[in-house]
Amino acid sequence: MSAAISRNWPAPAKLNLFLHINGRRTDGYHELQTLFQFIDYCDMLDFKVTDSSELILHSNMAGVVADSDNLILRAAKSLQQMTSFKGGAEIWLDKRLPMGGGLGGGSSDAATTLVALNTLWNTQLSTAELAKIGLKLGADIPVFIHGFAAFAEGIGERLQVVSPPEPWYLVIAPDAHVSTAEVFQDPLLPRNTPKLAIDTLMSQAWINDCQKLVVSKYPQVAKALGWLLEYAPSRMTGTGACVFGEFTQQQQALAALAKLPSDMQGFVAKGMNISPLITRLNHP
């Protein structure tokens, strides 16, 4: 008898509420201080456990390649190898988040895959063990696995749970693909922001050290940010291209969205300090 499909596992987007670059390490990675918060805008994944060890991925979006390099498949394969689980899975991805926009969609998909399959395969790894697997696949995967808004240091792997305000956001996804690698390799990127204590960082104005460089190189990002700043305090998330504005009320964000120029794409979402993935995990 075939296993039932376990449905509606969310892979939420994240925002970097601030992003400071403190220096460059000898291995080429950058020392960061950043604040991660989730939003209730998610990719959705369904899983079916199979007797075969094969891993099969389906997606609603062209360009999400179902090959061995896909982060979802790499995450599932890593969990198989770590636990010696003999079965496999068929996975369906409903891709809703913009790709390569600084919202962490690929990392979130991988994290949800690890959390869901650890439950469905009954492999019983701890959250810390799952995060260790995730870190080998991407520096920001652990924050999605832990599922709490967090202040992050190092290359983003040292996490401290925090509870920033949970406003409404209008997120705009400019029609531009910003290469994270190119941003971090650019000689004009600021790399000397002083490290500060978390209490100091939480109480001062929040900025993104990548924003000025990206805005100067990508006119689509500059246009979106300039438009959004007319309505709310706004900045870029990650290395872009997505930008977000903060609103205290949902109707304020929706009113701004209604005025969005036709050549821009956007959505309204709520800030969340507890990931929808944690809620799904606790209510199977």
Swiss-Prot record:
GO terms for biological process: isopentenyl diphosphate biosynthetic process, methylerythritol 4-phosphate pathway; terpenoid biosynthetic process. Its EC number is 2.7.1.148. Catalyzes the phosphorylation of the position 2 hydroxy group of 4-diphosphocytidyl-2C-methyl-D-erythritol. Belongs to the GHMP kinase family. IspE subfamily. The keyword Nucleotide-binding applies. ATP binds at P98, M99, G100, G101, G102, L103, G104, G105, G106, S107, S108. GO terms for molecular function: 4-(cytidine 5'-diphospho)-2-C-methyl-D-erythritol kinase activity; ATP binding. This is 4-diphosphocytidyl-2-C-methyl-D-erythritol kinase. It holds the Pfam family GHMP_kinases_N. Disulfide bonds: none annotated. It is an enzyme of class 2 (transferase). It catalyses: 4-CDP-2-C-methyl-D-erythritol + ATP = 4-CDP-2-C-methyl-D-erythritol 2-phosphate + ADP + H(+). Gene3D superfamilies: 3.30.230.10, GHMP kinase, C-terminal domain. Pathway: Isoprenoid biosynthesis; isopentenyl diphosphate biosynthesis via DXP pathway; isopentenyl diphosphate from 1-deoxy-D-xylulose 5-phosphate: step 3/6. Keywords: ATP-binding, Isoprene biosynthesis, Kinase, Nucleotide-binding, Transferase. The active site is at K14, D140.
